Amino acid sequence: MTESSFKLAIVVSQFNRAVTEKLLNGVLQRLTELDVQANQIKTVWVPGAVEIPLLAKRLAKSKHYQAIVCLGAVIRGETDHYNYVCQQVSYGCQQVALEYEVPIIFGVLTTTTKEQAFARAGGERGNKGADWADAAVSMIKLMKEIEITDE
């Protein structure tokens, strides 16, 4: 399977956009390095992290994409909201992957501080977006290798 034979989608949260734009740039830069063309990629923006699973489900249901990369940045605040958001988004993404058998790459940073988020979005810890792009391409290849045919 060549890199040019698939399509993937990227769902990006607008909340904490300064971080998520950097993550998106990391994904796109790595995909370019892997010779994935712009016409193979669809990027959609959602208001916040909680909305990611619904759009991921819609994209998976369309059967147009062989993987979906979900990007967000949830940064702990003073309330329990952080815990609920992190749990809902991770569970929702996993459910979509299992229901539609489409790799859903969980690219949602869950950090205690903004500094930690920026460190993982192109800062001293690198750009996790590149890792998630690699994971998407790897999973597309694995799913193709282990393709199940209807009998």
UniProtKB/Swiss-Prot annotation:
Q: What is its EC number?
A: 2.5.1.78
UniProt-annotated catalytic positions: 81
At which positions is (2S)-2-hydroxy-3-oxobutyl phosphate bound? 78-79, 120
Which CDD domains does UniProt cross-reference here?
Answer: Lumazine_synthase-I
Out of the domains of life, which is the source? Answer: Bacteria
Q: In which pathway does it act?
A: Cofactor biosynthesis; riboflavin biosynthesis; riboflavin from 2-hydroxy-3-oxobutyl phosphate and 5-amino-6-(D-ribitylamino)uracil: step 1/2
Signal peptide residues are none
Q: Name one GO biological process term.
A: riboflavin biosynthetic process
Q: Which UniProt keywords apply?
A: Riboflavin biosynthesis, Transferase
* UniProt cross-references to InterPro entries, sorted A to Z: LS (IPR034964), LS/RS (IPR002180), LS/RS_sf (IPR036467)
Q: Which family does it belong to?
A: Belongs to the DMRL synthase family.
Record's NCBIfam families? lumazine-synth
Please describe the quaternary structure of this protein. Answer: Forms an icosahedral capsid composed of 60 subunits, arranged as a dodecamer of pentamers.
Q: What does this protein do?
A: Catalyzes the formation of 6,7-dimethyl-8-ribityllumazine by condensation of 5-amino-6-(D-ribitylamino)uracil with 3,4-dihydroxy-2-butanone 4-phosphate. This is the penultimate step in the biosynthesis of riboflavin.
This chain's protein is named 6,7-dimethyl-8-ribityllumazine synthase
Q: Which gene encodes it?
A: ribH
